[in-house]
Amino acid sequence: KLYYAPMNRYLWLYAAIYLAGTWFSVTRAGSLLGGVLTVAFILFAVILENSITTRRQLDTLLLLLVMAGTAVALYGICQYLFGWGYQSAAWADSEMFGDVFRVPSTLENPNMLGQYLILAIPLGGAGLLAAKDWGMRVFYFCCCGVMCVCMLLTLSRGAWLGLLFAGFVFVLFLQPRLLLLTPLLLVGLYFVLPDAVINRFASIGNLGDSSTSYRVYIWMGTLAMLKDYWMCGIGPGDAAFNLVYPKYSYSGIVAPHAHNLFLQIVCDAGVVALVVFVLLLFHYFRDLCAAFCREKDPFSRLYQTAAVSGIAGFLVQAMTDYSFYNYRVLLLFWAWLALGALLARRGQLPERGLKV
């Protein structure tokens, strides 16, 4: 018997709409692989949600996710120290920032690495606050430190904004009064962070930066395209996007996607898909917030907060990039939704499985 979280009906509906969008794509052959993979990853959330049956399994999964995030971040730091890996000229405006090195780690793109770390860092923070002995506190502190350093090295402004918002939500849930210290924290960071990071952050919204103006032109072209295709979209994948978008592009800008998750969902499967996606997220957040309010166990409350803040921060960065373009990030997003659904009912799970 499958367990159904409140969001699951919308999850199934979203998968069905996305499959229909794939079938009716302007280029079915070009959309088929990406569309089917996306549907499979969406439904993986249901599988994961029903595979974890005890609190011990769930807690072990949480620990493994923090360790995996730390390993990925550590590899990214090594890339920076030893100059490993590929660097693309499209990742930064060389005229504004010079010859900067942005770490992609195993995600092949620093923005996608930032998306992943936004999900992982709140789990590490929850583990740090929930730890009951100094050994585990030091362990989680080191994990959080490694992931935060790697986040800085991505030089991803969207990811930084997403992480700041995730931190805001995290503190808002647990100790709202600490938000009064935010101005002092920001001033302190100004004196501690390297100039490269400060300059990069200060350039947010500067249309003189080619990557910013590039995104704005893509959004304008995408909105112009959606005036004609808002109902059913054009189908998922860059093949469908590149078949239609060039007719609407501004300044001849070439792009594989809309550089905005919400715009891209409408491109892939129409406005109904976006409405269902928003409803899915609404039920995800509502379920976790309700569980947080009635939960008495501090451990569960901490990780429920991490699940809310991680996805909230992820969605902030998703406004500046198409997060699901990288299939690993796509799979992780749906896995995190399943994780949130599990954490919402952690108190109802048995401590261990029944012995047979």
Question: What would you call each of these model-derived segments?
Answer:
Residues 33-34, 105-117, 237, 266-270, ...:
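Membrane-interface micro-motifs in multi-pass membrane enzymes
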